[in-house]
Amino acid sequence: MNRSPSSSGLLPLPGAPSSSWALYRARLSSLLQSVDTAVFIAFWLFGLINNVLYVIILSAAQDLVGNGIPKGVVLLADVMPSFLTKLVAPYFIHRIPYATRIFIFVTLSSAGMLLIAFTPPSRSVAVKLIGVVLSSISSGGGELSFLGLTHYYGHMSLAAWGSGTGGAGLIGSLLYVMLTDWIGLSVKTSLLASAFLPIIMLVSFFLILPHGPLRASARKTYEPIANRDSFQEESEGAENNFDDIPTSTASSSLLAPGPAVAATAYSSHPTEDARKDSLAAKIQRSKSLFFPYMLPLLLVYIAEYTINQGVSPTLLFPLESSPFAEFRSFYPFYGFLYQVGVFISRSSIAFIRIHHLYLPSLLQVANLVLLTLHALLNFIPSVYIVFVIIFWEGLLGGCVYVNTFAEIMEHVPAEDREFSLGATSVSDSGGICVASFLSMAMEIWLCNWQVDHGRDWCRRIKAG
């Protein structure tokens, strides 16, 4: 069933018949008054910490592998494990309690960053990539878990998560530039400091996030359901048993599910036949998600990460006409500008909604074509114009990401929503996987083209 913006907790799209400044002021006031501060902070920190190491690793890609290896190699190691995790985990991860998942994610991500930091330059790049893989598995499992968790805390938790992921990009890229370029710390020291960031997820889950809905739903045990009538009886009984679920805004408004939904989601293990039926139903639901939600998210990620890892390392200008003292500074600064755009657009979901997801996706493809042509033909006269394009790229990418999941929360039935949110998240990792292969080929091709045509700047880059 379709939901209007006002009924879903979102502000209407500017220019829509239902929009007006009075409605905006009233809706904004309502949103601010209804926000459960603890829920918002917890999900913002989830989004921030789950994604910040991923961003730091990509920002450090040039320093990890040097200029002799395509940066797409780091991107592939940073996203392929995450992609595989999100591809298979939605079908079994619901059997693992959220508290256990948090400990697993923190252990994997911290161990990965420590391995990267302590691997000496004399050792093979492959050893560092193992650490990248560990962090990637943690990030993938964390994303689908926290997106699924937003189902129980409503639209504002999704807005907080989206803003946190955008903040991760901004803070991660800025932090790496600040530590290595501005403060002058070594790459090892910078990466070592970041290894302790995942501890914040433990604080967020166990000390900040209200656990009322989760504790209440966990008390409900599963009983086999014989037919539809008995299912309805169980649902009614579940609602009666869940009267003690807190009625704060986190659990009762902004698309929070009913008690029966929580009982079903947190019930104990079903029979074998029910498992088979559930798996078949989930596969069928995944197919129905592809064209309206998965494909536009896939397209935008293919385009933007091909730009970030395959094209931007070759978007170089003479140092005297740029704000940089060395060529290695272009790449991380492009990443920072991109993340600024992502943060702004992912944080705007409560105020601006985009329902036509394919439009920004196709605009992102146009960005890829434009910047690739410049890398070949060198027709953009100033690096500052490229700065604007990269910032616009970030706006488009963040817009598609957060609006895709907002559309799911509005249009997918409540009983399917938790699975749909997690399953759709495979598209961003899938798109990045495709982009990693494209970018490895494109960076080498574009750099060779530039050298052959008298621009050898890409060969002058020295790793930090």
UniProtKB/Swiss-Prot annotation:
An example Gene Ontology CC term for this record: vacuolar membrane
A Pfam entry, by short name: CLN3
Membrane topology note: Multi-pass membrane protein
InterPro entries attached to this UniProt entry: Battenin_disease_Cln3, Battenin_disease_Cln3_subgr, MFS_trans_sf
Segments passing through the bilayer: 38-58, 73-93, 102-122, 129-149, 167-187, 190-210, 288-308, 332-352, 354-374, 376-396
GO biological process assignments: L-arginine transmembrane transport; lysine transport; regulation of intracellular pH
UniProt keyword terms in alphabetical order: Amino-acid transport, Membrane, Signal, Transmembrane, Transmembrane helix, Transport, Vacuole
Compartments it resides in: Vacuole membrane
Gene3D superfamilies to which the protein is assigned, alphabetical: MFS general substrate transporter like domains
Endpoints of the signal sequence: 1-22
Superkingdom of origin: Eukaryota
UniProt record similarity statement: Belongs to the battenin family.
Protein purpose: Involved in vacuolar transport and vacuole pH homeostasis. Also required for cytokinesis.
Protein name: Protein btn-1
